[in-house]
Every structure is written in structure tokens, then in C-alpha cells.
């Protein structure tokens, strides 16, 4: 928990600060803006911040694939208000999709992001060796974000 908290506390404070700056304009937030802010703050700008983020995502990948009830409770207890605010903004950005579906799509998106970033070093090596294409984290995130946005915007049909 302490490891997650060292990453999540500054991350959640930065997100809260960004959202607070919106003031009364929260209802005008677009999906692209919301996800872009989350990703930019999670990844950071410096090489050190990016390395730290990749370590966090590797740990998150381990936690995500195992039943970690204590971590789920920890996140719920410590970051519930921020997640509820995020979900409210998501609902405003995509009013045609029910909140329960947005909750699921958030988990699908998180899974995609975690899987991609926890294996970034391997993906970088494969891309270089097999395709002669060096990948930087910024380029991967630049391509990952539209993929995640498309997942959120996928048509909803009650099944």
C-alpha cells in the first residue's frame, strides 16, 4: 500500500488541482480532455517521472491480475472521492452511456493502459528488433489515448 500511496497521493493531488481549476465549467469537460489530463499527469514530463510511472504500472499490473482485496479497500477508502468525481465527469462527457457501463469501460481502459505500460520495455525492444522502429513512451501514449477514447465511445447496446 505504501508503494501505491507514494505514486497515487501526488497523482491524485495533481488531478484534483487540475479539476478544481475548471470551477463551474466541469460540465463542459470532454472525454479527450479528461483522459488526456489523467495520462499526462500519470506519465509525467521528465525521464525520472516516466521511469517512476512505468514502475508503478508494473506493480499495478501485478495487483490488477491478482485478487488484492486489501488494495481495493485501500484505494476505495483513500481515493473514492476523486474516483466519484472522475465518474461524474465521465458521465457528463458521455451522457448516452449508463454509469454502470462507464464503470466497466473505465476498467477495460485501465486494463489496456496497465498492460501496455507494464510491458513497455519489452514492447520497446520488440518494436526496435522486429520493425526497426524505436518507441518512446510519449509516442506510445500518443497512440494509446485514441484507442482508449474509441473504447469509451463505442456504441452502447443493452444486451
Question: Which stretches of residues belong to each language-model region?
Answer:
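An amphipathic alpha-helix adjacent to DNA-recognition modules
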Residues: 1-20, 24, 28, 72, ...
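Hydrophobic alpha-helical connector segments
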Residues: 13-56
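Short linear capping/connector segments at secondary-structure termini
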Residues: 20-21, 60-62, 126-130
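A short secondary-structure junction motif
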Residues: 10-14, 18, 63, 67, ...
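C-terminal peripheral helix-coil segments that are non-catalytic and often amphipathic
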Residues: 33, 41, 77-159
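Amphipathic alpha-helical segments used for helix-helix packing
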Residues: 33, 50-77, 121-124
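Hydrophobic faces of stable alpha-helices that mediate helix-helix packing
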Residues: 8, 12, 57, 80-87
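Amphipathic, well-packed alpha-helical segments that form the structural scaffold of globular domains
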Residues: 12, 16, 39-40, 61, ...
